[in-house]
């Protein structure tokens, strides 16, 4: 599994993150279980909003108020309860998380939403920065939705750079295949952030699967089953 296409992308994502964070703090100093909320807030400066009864409706209402608009809701979009949600778009990128979850579950949900952000936003932003380094400040403002720059969009089009993504809002029975693929990817990234492959495999002992599962929960904070 380590050499699968999925895992190679996961390793590329996490390595890019650790390289970026190296200018802020030493990733090797992050103790297990890792505090994902701290990493999001101080490493990537992405806001985290906790809601005790998080739902799609609650998130939309919050974003309306943040944009200075009257709260509104589209009747054709069914409301549903959420553990977490990544919003990509104006007024800024935000991660929502349900506040009344157990600490280790909330930490995992945040890691999952961070996985979406890293794969769908962060890597694309890093590619733009690498391709157009002279536009660094503009790219950072554009990717944080502080402004729209038509010239930058044109340069990106000429260079063949990918567009900024939109947020996922559809899950459940109507889940699109590409969205399901993104969910699997975010789940794998979350697990790699919380329990790095190389660290975990060095601790595994044959014929001790029960003890190993308990170790993943106690030392790394992994939930016993997939939640998101």
Where on the chain are the PLM-derived regions?
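Active-site hotspot residues in diverse enzymes, especially metal/ion-binding acidic/histidine motifs
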Residues: 1-228
